[in-house]
Structures are given as C-alpha cells and as structure tokens.
C-alpha cells in the first residue's frame, strides 16, 4: 500500500493537503485520511468497473426471469454496495496503517525471499484466505449473527455481478479479514499484495455472475455460489470446495443449472423452489422480499 500512497501523494495529495490543511506525509492523521479515501474510491472503481463489465458481457440475463429475482434488484444491489463501501474502507484503514508502519511481512524485492518462495506464496495466500473466509462465512450464518450482519447479502437469491459487494460493511470486512491477516503471518511481495487485492475483488464478482460454465469438483465457481444463495447452508468457501468438503457443508450444483433450457423448466423450478422455501423459512422465518414475478402478477 505504500507504493500506492506514494504515487497518490506525489501526483495529487500533496497539492490537496497543501491547499486545504498542510500535513507531513508521515503524519498518521494524514495517512489515515488518505488511506480511507484511496480504499473507498479504489474499491468503488474496481467494483463498478468489473461488475459492470461482467453484467454487460458475462451475466446471463435470462436469470432475471427467475421467479425469485427481485423487483428493482440491480438498482438495490448497486445502492447497497455504494452505501457500505465507505464503512468497509474505514474498517480496513487500521490494517493498511499497520502495513505502512512496518508491522507486517510485506517486502519489496523478490530476491528478499527468493523466487521459489515468491511462487509458493501465491497458492499459500489462496489457501489461507479460503480457510479463513470459510470460517468467517460460516460464523456469519450462525443463527444469532445471520439476521444482524449477513441477511442483507442473502436478500439476493438470484444474483447479478453487482451483488458481489452488496452487504453490510461489517459483513464485508469480516470476509475480507483473512486477506489482511495473511501478510502479518507470512512474507508477501508488496506489488503481489496489491494484485491479489484486485484479484479477490474480481473473484467475488465472478462467483456472482450467473455464468455456470464449469462444475469443477475443486474450484468454487458461480454455480457453487449460486447453490449457497438458494440453499443457504452450503458452499461457504470462496476459492475452492476443499473446506466445505472437510466441514461437511459441500453441495454440488444442481445439474440442471448447466443446461439453459432445463434450468427454466417449470418442473425443475418447482422442485428447486420447494426446497428453497423450506430452507429459507427455517433460516429466516417470514419473507419480506418483493419478487419481480409477484410484482408482475399484481399489475395484471
């Protein structure tokens, strides 16, 4: 993060602070303010850019005809994300500050730990994050925690890419915590850290994009995560299915999801919706969602 902050200082922030309220670059108040806005606007840029590209070119828009797609859902997803990104940025600032002040194992040169470790650190990051997110996500589904923190994200049953960041600030922060913890336990190249931070944002969008290409037994793809949103209590992992398998929470995607015609079959949908309603009622009780199908019926 120091690379990004230095560039921002050099090309924009020095001039802004000098004009508004002069503070030295190493002033912790200035650093905190700068990191907050960089994280907020950077996160917003990544979210709106990647989610919009995915929505335009990848997302299967026939899913918007699903009976559990919500009225004004895309607008609500974007609004929810934009309302909560500042809070997520605020919660993230202390971690970036700690990294900036040398409390992490972030390093500058690949030669510091060697090429072999550098290459090994990439899958290590993925597995560490996947393990941490699995347990954070499972914690968020605890019956006392779910209605207070995570229920908002499960408002979206049939997701669009914009649902990827549409959750409460504390929810998003808890699920991102393993990313920030990693460099405090293991050495990680600084530029790689920034690249991985971008990658995890992209991955979050990808597993919400509704493009059910692969039923890979190892990789947690969009179909697996769709199963999580429909059936609630399965597939908590982010990148792989490993920890769901070990934690007995893995559920293979429904085969019908990989066949566009079969996916829209009334009999297939009836079975899917019966199970969805049973699980949703157990997890949430009364349903306060306004589905587009119900709205259309009211208008006729």
Swiss-Prot record:
Signal peptide: none annotated. A motif (Histidine box-3) lies at residues 225-229. Induction: Expression is anaerobically up-regulated via the sterol regulatory element binding protein sre1. It catalyses: episterol + 2 Fe(II)-[cytochrome b5] + O2 + 2 H(+) = 5-dehydroepisterol + 2 Fe(III)-[cytochrome b5] + 2 H2O. One of its GO terms (cellular component) is Golgi apparatus. Disruption phenotype: Abolishes the production of ergosterol when erg32 is also deleted. The double disruptant also leads to susceptibility to cycloheximide and to staurosporine, but does not affect tolerance to nystatin and to amphotericin B. Its cofactor is Fe cation. InterPro entries: Fatty_acid_hydroxylase, Sterol_Desaturase_Related. One of its GO terms (molecular function) is delta7-sterol 5(6)-desaturase activity. A motif (Histidine box-2) lies at residues 150-154. The chain crosses the membrane at residues 33-53, 78-98, 117-137, 180-200. Residues 123-248 form the Fatty acid hydroxylase domain. It is a multi-pass membrane protein. It comes from the Eukaryota. It is found in: Endoplasmic reticulum membrane. Keywords: Endoplasmic reticulum, Iron, Lipid biosynthesis, Lipid metabolism, Membrane, Oxidoreductase, Steroid biosynthesis, Steroid metabolism, Sterol biosynthesis, Sterol metabolism, Transmembrane, Transmembrane helix. The keyword Secreted does not apply. One of its GO terms (biological process) is ergosterol biosynthetic process. The third module or late pathway involves the ergosterol synthesis itself through consecutive reactions that mainly occur in the endoplasmic reticulum (ER) membrane. Firstly, the squalene synthase erg9 catalyzes the condensation of 2 farnesyl pyrophosphate moieties to form squalene, which is the precursor of all steroids. Belongs to the sterol desaturase family. The histidine box domains may contain the active site and/or be involved in metal ion binding. In Aspergillus, the biosynthesis pathway of the sterol precursors leading to the prevalent sterol ergosterol differs from yeast. The ringsystem of lanosterol in S.cerevisiae is firstly demethylised in three enzymatic steps leading to the intermediate zymosterol and secondly a methyl group is added to zymosterol by the sterol 24-C-methyltransferase to form fecosterol. In Aspergillus, lanosterol is firstly transmethylated by the sterol 24-C-methyltransferase leading to the intermediate eburicol and secondly demethylated in three steps to form fecosterol. This is Delta(7)-sterol 5(6)-desaturase erg31. It comes from Schizosaccharomyces pombe (strain 972 / ATCC 24843). The lineage of its organism: Eukaryota, Fungi, Dikarya, Ascomycota, Taphrinomycotina.
